[in-house]
Amino acid sequence: MAAEPTKAEIQAVFKRLRAAPTNKSCFDCGAKNPSWASIPYGVFLCIDCSGVHRSLGVHLSFIRSTELDSNWSWFQLRCMQVGGNASANAFFHQHGATTSDTNAKYNSRSAQMYREKIRQLANAAMSKHGTDLWIDGMNCALVQPAEKKESDFFAEMTQPSSSWEATPASEPTSTTVTTVTRTISSPETADSASAECGPSVDILSTSPKAAVEVKPSLIGKKKVNTAKKGLGAKKGLGAQKVSSQSFSEIERRAQVAEKLREQQAAELKKEAEESLVSSMRLAYQELQIDRKQEEKKLQNLEGKKREQAERLGMGLAARSSISHSLLSEMHVIEQETPVANKSSRSQLDLLEDASFTSGPPKYKDNPFSLGDGFSSRWETESSSWGSADKAEEEREVTISSIQPARDRPANRRKPEGAPAPESNEARMKFASAKAISSDMFFGRENDAEYEARSRLQQLSSSNSISSADLFGDPNAVNLSGGVSLGNVMPAADITHFKQGVKSVAGKMAVLANGVMNSLQDRYSSY
C-alpha cells in the first residue's frame, strides 16, 4: 500500500491548484478565496457552501478543508488534480444542469455522471503516476516548498513560448493540461522550476534584439482573454444574455393572457345579466297575473265594499307572491243576538253624561265590548242594578268615540232573524228584586214566598221600616211610585258608581280610538 502524502506535499498541490483563476472563487456562489473542497467533484467551495454540501450527505459530496485537514489520501489529491472548477462548470453547462438549487443540482443525472467521470480519471492517474506529486510530467516542480530560492530573471523572461501556446484561445480549457500550463506563470512555480534545473543560459545564444522582441509577445499572449471566453468564472451558473426579442415575446404572451381573462370575465358577466333579466321577467309576469286576479275580485264586489277597497287600495298591487290581500278576506261581520239585557234603559237614562253614547253592536272580534263579566260584577255589588230582565233582547251599550251607532251604515247590521217580542211581565215582576233565581224567573216558586223574600231583600238596607213597608200596604207613598234611584242604590254608592263609569268610559274611548287608527293605517298601506 502506498504511503500517505505528507503535509508539505498536500500544501504544494493545493498551492498550485488554487493558483488557477477559476479556482480562486467558490464553485457554487462565486465567493473569493475558497478554502474547502468537494472531493467527488474536484471543486473548491467557500465555508457557507461547504455546510450545504455536508447536509447533502457523503454519498453525494464529501467535504475537506484545504488548509486545516492533513489526512488527505493520494486518491483524494488525484480527484482534485483531474477536476477543478473550470472542468466542472463546463460539464454542467454542457449537460444543462444550470439551476441554482443546490439540492436539485447535485441530485441530478449530470452530477452523477460527473462524479463517475472524476472517479475514473482519478483511478487512471493513480495507476499511471502512483505516488508522484504531479501528473503532468513536470517533475521539476516543488519538492521542498519551504526552502526559499532566488528568482532567476532570465528564466522568467526566456520561458519557451510553447508553454503559453499549449492551449489555443478557441480550444476549451476544461482539461488538466490547461490548468497546469496556466499556473506556470506564477512566481512560485518559476522558483520551483529553477530549483533543480538551474538558471537558463539560452539568452547568451540569442541576439539582444530577439530577446527584446520576445518580451512584448509574451506579455501580449499573457493578456489574452481566454479565461473570460471559455471559463465563465464571473457568469455564474448558466446565466444567459436576455435579448429584446425574449422581452417582446413575454410581453405579447402577457397581453394575450390578459385579453383571454377579460373575455372570460365579460362572458360570465353577460350570463349573470341574462339570468337576472329572465328571472325579473318571470317575476313581472307573475305580478301581472296576480294583479289581474285582484282586479277581477274587485269588480265582483258590490256597492260600498268596492268603494272602500278602491279608497284603501286593498289588494290592487301585490308586492310579492306572498303578499297579503285584504280584498280576499273582507266579509260582513254579523251582529250577535244578545242573550239577555245587562242593564235597564231607565237606569242608564239617569246618568246624564256626555261621554255616554250608543255604541256599535257587539261583534265577534271586538276586544272592547262589555261582556257578561262586567255586568255580573255590577249586579252583585249594586243594590238593585241587576234587576234587569235577562229575557229582553236589546243591543249592548258600548263606548265609542269614533262614530255613533246611529250614524253607521245600515248594511253593517244584518240580524240573523227577527227578534222575539219583548215582554214587560218579567221586568215589572223583578223590578225591585236585588237578585233572582231560575225558579223565581220561570215561576216555579210560590208567589207569597217570593213576595215576602223580595220585601225582606228590599228592606235589608233600610235604617227603619214600618208595617206598611213590611206587609206591602198599597196606600203607602214610598211604594206607589215607579223605580227611583234611591230604591236602586244608596247615595254614596251612586256617586262612586258615576265616577267609576266616567273613568272606565274615558279609558275605553282612548283605547278604541287608538286601535281604530292603527287598523286604518295598517290596512290603508296595502
UniProtKB/Swiss-Prot annotation:
The keyword Methyltransferase does not apply. Residues 247-314 form a coiled coil. Gene3D superfamilies: Arf GTPase activating protein. Residues 165-180 have a biased composition (Low complexity). GO terms for molecular function: GTPase activator activity; zinc ion binding. InterPro entries: ARFGAP/RecO, ArfGAP_dom, ArfGAP_dom_sf. Keywords: Coiled coil, Cytoplasm, ER-Golgi transport, Golgi apparatus, GTPase activation, Membrane, Metal-binding, Protein transport, Transport, Zinc, Zinc-finger. One of its GO terms (biological process) is protein transport. It comes from the Eukaryota. Residues 159-180, 354-426 are annotated as: Disordered. It is found in: Cytoplasm; Golgi apparatus membrane. It is a peripheral membrane protein. Residues 11-127 form the Arf-GAP domain. Pfam families: ArfGap (PF01412). One of its GO terms (cellular component) is Golgi membrane. Residues 405-416 have a biased composition (Basic and acidic residues). Residues 97-526 are annotated as: Required for interaction with coatomer. The keyword Mitochondrion does not apply. Interacts with the coatomer complex. Interacts with the C-terminal appendage domain of COPG1. GTPase-activating protein (GAP) for ADP ribosylation factor 1 (ARF1). Implicated in coatomer-mediated protein transport between the Golgi complex and the endoplasmic reticulum. Hydrolysis of ARF1-bound GTP may lead to dissociation of coatomer from Golgi-derived membranes to allow fusion with target membranes. This is ADP-ribosylation factor GTPase-activating protein 2. It comes from Xenopus tropicalis (Western clawed frog).
